[in-house]
Amino acid sequence: MKVLALRHSVAQVYADTQIYTHDETKDDYENAFLISNLTTHNILYLNYSVKTLQILNKSGIAAVEIQEMDELFTLIRCNFTYDYIDDIVYLHDYSYYTNNEIRTDQHWVTKTNIEDYLLPGWKLTYVGYNGNDTRGHYNFSFKCQNAATDDDAIIEYIYSNELDFQNFILKKIKERMTTSLPIARLSNRVFRDKLFKTLVSDHSRVVNVGPRNESMFTFLDHPSIKQFSNGPYLVKDTIKLKQERWLGKRLSQFDIGQYKNMLNVLTTLYQYYDMYHEKPIIYMVGSAPSYWIHDVRQYSNLKFETWDPLDTPYSDLHHKELFYISDVTKLKDNSILYVDIRTDRENTDWKAWRKIVEEQTINNLNIAYKYLSTGKAKVCCVKMTAMDLELPISAKLLHHPTTEIRSEFYLIMDIWDSKNIKRFIPKGVLYSYINNVITENVFIQQPFKLKTLRNEYVVALYALSNDFNNREDVIKLVNNQKNALITVRINNTFKDEPKVGFKDIYDWTFLPTDFETNESIITSYDGCLGMFGLSISLASKPTGNNHLFILSGTNKYFKLDQFANHMSISRRSHQIRFSESATSYSGYIFRDLSNNNFNLIGTNVENSVSGHVYNALIYYRYNYSFDLKRWIYLHATNKAGIEGGRYYEHAPIELIYACRSAKEFAKLQDDLTVLRYSNEIEDYINKVYSITYADDPNYFIGIKFKNIPYEYDVKVPHLTFGVLNISDSMVPDVVAILKKFKSELFRMDVTTSYTYMLSDEIYVANVSGVLSTYFKLYNAFYKEQITFGQSRMFIPHITLSFSNKKVVRIDSTRLNIDFIYLRKIKGDTVFDMTE
């Protein structure tokens, strides 16, 4: 949902939009809670409170102040990610298709012939890093830029088996127009940029597990971050390959040679970062014009020095000349060298050309060896061709996508590799590598071992759920890693499947109860965003591809009502109960009936079950930004930090009742996952709360009324307002609590409206209006370790007779309290009080 804050109402009506006017009788937190549970996508928030907007944004719900109608029109028609700290709106708006254009934030693409293969009459537009160049389109009171591009489709095309780009991009645009927007992917780059800038400033050592190409720009400015990936393809790994011949295959209609060069250099750069944790000088020989340097410059101040007879416009220092092996002495330490020398073939005879290529390959290799033979802190990437070669067994092979698969590949070596054992590799084996292997990632660092790192902050986004990881080892890492942000796939199945298929792999599934964490926040993507200064206009949907975000060691853990809080906890319930269910009271009715409380009068205002916990369990797929386990634990240990607002603390028994209702709901729905989750949450409640039951009571609290509107034959009809199991020495403690609650007890609006047979020969009158105070009293006794209440649900009633009587119904009648007392069962009254 998105909240657009206005000072005045607007005349225009928008689809899927609701108006909410700030309620001055309620505080900012309660207003935020009410807004978050509205069911429409767009909320126009009138007479807004800035504090309420802050609360929503911290909860991951995008809430933006609107000053002009243009701002309203722009934000209401598309989704966006909001940086609420720096007041920047990142639109995810594809309406630019109506201008017959596709967009890119990678400058190199604009220098290709891609426009020859677009839809008729279409053009390509460069919009800069995260759409930064579009800011001029929006003259708003907040910074605004459109981060939507088609780079995902362009890159997917490059790695696909499709050659016809026009058909491919047409298909992708149609998909985009007919399926739900994958907004988490769109906002992920904004999130990653913010995340790692924050972590690097707060932690001296940061580890990142499983980065992919979409992160290749994110880490350019963070050489200190240790990357773990799937490892490199080494020269020695070719021993598994059978010999093949030249294949020759076109991968792309438009020229992607620059993309290949960029990937080669970035792969080399991240190898250097992995070894030396600082930025090198980047030397490049050949590969002009290297327009992609402009893309790298958007993210980092890396320095480039280049050699090529052709211009390289974005180089810091360009030598418009050939580079010879004698020039290697000009290259400094603390650098990387990219050698991409190959003379254009033009009209040269094939055999003569092949001889030239092989000579240049040997020359390239000699340049690399000479560069690595002296000095320190050096990594080299060199262009090779398939031919009989001796190569270091530990050197890394690269074959990033290029326009046509021919005979070229690349080799990365560091100083140690260049001096390592060399092995003869036949030409046919290298052709086999070229024909069958595409390097899919610029990150080729070693795989991560699932072990706790003592002094590092570990980030593992979408990297650990794969079933080639041991599930118990993943759980152990989450439990024991002190500082971390780790994601795992949430169990969205209804049959409690331990793993699910995704693309061509299988992932383990998890629930929050799979983890034993006391100082970790377990939330959703949008809940996590709120903790890093971001919010989003479209909440996560239960697609089956959803992840739990687990933050360990965060200073926000105790800020219970600010982050990963209960905002939107009833939203799914509202959507169902007002559109699909038998009555809007269905949730209240079901919760009472499933706990054998059959008095449904006023059930919507006097419910005996925690609606928060019930909704968090049965609709966990729709709102898992609310960290239920943390909420339970912090209340149980009395450590919950509440910033403000009228905050109701549930008695532990209300939480137990909610689990019981959720379990019955799950059985009716045949939802085995909710059934397990509810059982495990109930076990967790019993673990963190020291709940004792007065199932063998020796004292009770009684309430005598001045008026009973029914006939009775018991001596003193009264309401048993709870039973206790205490020693006589604890009586003063009980009395002290009763005195503390005196005012609230006598203010209860107690009513009755019918009689019924509680069981055979026990004739009683119903009592309404006391449950809220009962649970508050329960909490007060619990905190003083006084055993109060039984394991079965408290159903308030007044016993009228120990015989069978006819049921009577009357108009709701107020019962006036005469006095309240504490009495020993089968004993004397030890305390009483009147108003």
From Swiss-Prot:
Keyword S-adenosyl-L-methionine: yes
Key word Methyltransferase present: yes
Reaction equation(s) it catalyzes: a 5'-end diphospho-ribonucleoside in mRNA + GTP + H(+) = a 5'-end (5'-triphosphoguanosine)-ribonucleoside in mRNA + diphosphate; a 5'-end (5'-triphosphoguanosine)-ribonucleoside in mRNA + S-adenosyl-L-methionine = a 5'-end (N(7)-methyl 5'-triphosphoguanosine)-ribonucleoside in mRNA + S-adenosyl-L-homocysteine; 5'-triphosphoadenylyl-(2'->5')-adenylyl-(2'->5')-adenosine + 2 H2O = 2 AMP + ATP + 2 H(+)
Pfam families xref list: Rotavirus_VP3
InterPro entries found in the cross-reference section: VP3_Rotav
Single Gene Ontology MF annotation: RNA binding
Region (2'-5'-phosphodiesterase activity): 693-835
Entry remark concerning the domains of this protein: Contains a bipartite N7-methyltransferase domain, a 2'-O-methyltransferase domain and a GTase/RTPase domain. The C-terminus contains a phosphodiesterase domain that degrades the 5'-triphosphorylated, 2'-5' linked adenylate oligomers produced by the host cell in response to IFN stimulation.
Subunit-structure text: Interacts with VP1. Interacts with VP2.
Function: Multifunctional enzyme involved in mRNA capping. Catalyzes the formation of the 5' cap structure on the viral plus-strand transcripts. Specifically binds to GTP and displays guanylyltransferase and methyltransferase activities. Has affinity for ssRNA but not for dsRNA. Capping activity is non-specific and caps RNAs that initiate with either a G or an A residue. Together with VP1 polymerase, forms a VP1-VP3 complex positioned near the channels situated at each of the five-fold vertices of the core.
Protein name: Protein VP3
Taxonomic source organism: Rotavirus A (strain RVA/Cow/United States/WC3/1981/G6P7[5])
